């Protein structure tokens, strides 16, 4: 039986804000966000662009990564992205 992979991802919204999320299909989830059918937050800040994603074998670990990102200050989110060599500016 194949194991399922879960992802934590970070989007850059049109207003320059970051959005952290969780999914089992990054490509489909980003398309859903850009169709305005994702989170209310991103629907009001279209379009969004995928900046980063990280795979996890365990759902809890992916959800934990999302929770920790969402509870950081803007500065700490920027540091996280820079530490992962993500160009977003």
Curated annotation (Swiss-Prot):
Q: Where is the GIY-YIG domain?
A: 4-79
Q: Which domain of life is it from?
A: Bacteria
Record-linked InterPro entries:
GIY-YIG_endonuc, GIY-YIG_endonuc_sf, UPF0213_domain
Gene3D superfamilies, per this entry? Answer: GIY-YIG endonuclease
Q: Which SUPFAM superfamilies match?
A: GIY-YIG endonuclease (SSF82771)
Any Pfam family matching the protein: GIY-YIG
Q: By its UniProt entry, which PROSITE patterns does this protein fall under?
A: GIY_YIG
PANTHER family for the chain: UPF0213 PROTEIN YHBQ
Family the entry assigns: Belongs to the UPF0213 family.
Protein name as catalogued = UPF0213 protein LSEI_1587
